């Protein structure tokens, strides 16, 4: 048997030189400009996916589905998408609230074997488009970034190679380091991930 999922989204820019192919029957949506759809996917689908990966890993959840079925993390993912959605000029005819709920349903699908560690592992280079872009847009508009900031903090904690139970993952620490170094080179800086000592917040 083949495991599938009900979620589908296939958007194609309507620019064909020899006539448009008849792909409507398989669910293709032809649009004049795919950029709004790409931005929507990056900031909503990918941003929430990364959020669940970082925070889910830190909370000890092995899979994205397990993280999404945690009431608290699901609420955070919804909040991240709500903050990000406010930075979008949504594609015409797209109900962003319905789209966000369809993503939550997809993330909760236990038949999808995506692990939090796998999704989080290559996220450092993707963070600017997924989380930092909407965060900056909200800051520029004078809006709060409480949950987007939490997602970014989750990435920072993940980069230390430890979860919230203080279990060290050498493999993750080693794998994440080259991405941090790559980012540092772009900004002519050096990266040192320092642990925050235990104790009450200051």
Region spans (language model):
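Substrate/ligand-engaging "lid" and interaction regions
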Residues: 1-202
């Amino acid at each position: 048997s083949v495991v599938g999922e009900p979620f589908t989204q296939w958007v194609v820019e309507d620019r064909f030189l020899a006539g448009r192919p008849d792909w409507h029957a398989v669910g293709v949506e032809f649009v004049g400009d795919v950029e709004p759809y790409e931005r929507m996917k990056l900031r909503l689908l990918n941003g929430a996916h990364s959020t669940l990966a970082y925070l889910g890993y830190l909370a000890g959840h092995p899979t994205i589905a397990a993280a999404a079925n945690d009431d608290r993390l699901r609420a955070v993912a919804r909040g991240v998408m709500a903050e990000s959605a406010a930075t979008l000029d949504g594609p015409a005819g797209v109900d962003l609230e319905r789209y966000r709920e369809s993503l939550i349903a997809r993330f909760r699908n236990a038949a999808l074997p995506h692990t939090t560690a796998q999704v989080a592992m290559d996220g450092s280079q993707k963070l600017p488009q997924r989380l930092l872009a909407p965060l900056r847009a909200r800051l520029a508009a004078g809006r709060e970034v409480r949950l987007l900031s939490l997602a970014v903090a989750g990435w920072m904690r993940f980069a230390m190679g430890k979860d919230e139970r203080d279990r060290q993952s050498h493999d993750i620490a080693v794998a994440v380091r080259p991405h941090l170094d790559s980012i540092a080179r772009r900004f002519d800086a050096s990266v040192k991930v320092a642990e925050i000592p235990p104790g009450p917040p200051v």
